[in-house]
Amino acid sequence: MKSLLRSTMALALAATFAHAAFAQEALIRKNLAERLPDFPKIDEVNKTAIPGLYEVRIGTEIVYTDEHGDHVIQGNIIDTRTRRDVTQARIDKITAIDFAALPLKDAIVWKQGSGERKLVVFADPNCGYCKKFETEMQQVKDVTVYTFLIPILGGDSPDKARNVWCARDNATVWRDWMIKGAAAPRSMGNCDVTALQRNLVMAKKYRVTGTPALVFEDGKRVPGALPPAEVEKQLVASRGKA
């Protein structure tokens, strides 16, 4: 009987706290929407470890507010005890991608050395930073690189992506273009380019809006290019977590 009573009380308390949390979130959403009509659509409101401070997630961005939505704070929270960037850690979690779920069959694949480590790159054939990154990746050993072509920069990017993808040895053609500037031969005849469309859909799903964008085995994603030493560091770290 006592056990049943304790269980009932615990459930009642849990329901009370849940209702209070929902009411607080609703108040914050309401006040921000009414007071800031141009405020972006809110995806989540979560209580933080700091009393009275709430996290507001807008897509992959984080801002903070008080319990009434009276103030909005932009910036990163640093835990001075651990020197941990709490905000960045949260963003890393939000933006993480399940590496195992990526459709690698739609990627151009090349490797160096054993290829035991893996890296995904979203790239546009006209992306200057992608070319620099591809060139510098020659310094990184024992890695397999999966490149998803996403022609998002306009101009002749779609044509170049098609020419590369349809080449018999698209990995060699891709690297020759990115590193040496040797244009891919024009694609002639029938070629299934639906993979390129799927890549664009996937990029939109994961909110990849610029190139290059990197994804490591542990799901960590990095917008933009990294120098070889930092790529190496991230590859080692991702193998430890994957």
Where are these regions (language model features)?
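Extracytoplasmic thiol/disulfide redox context detector
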Residues: 2-7, 16-162, 176-179, 187-210, ...
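N-terminal low-complexity, Ser/Thr/acidic repeat segments characteristic of secreted
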Residues: 10-12
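Short strand-coil-strand connectors
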Residues: 59, 217-218
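Alpha-helical "lid/cap" subdomains adjacent to substrate-binding clefts that gate access
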Residues: 164-182
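Short, flexible loop motifs at catalytic/binding sites
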Residues: 214
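Structural signal for short hydrophobic segments within the conserved structured cores
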Residues: 220-223
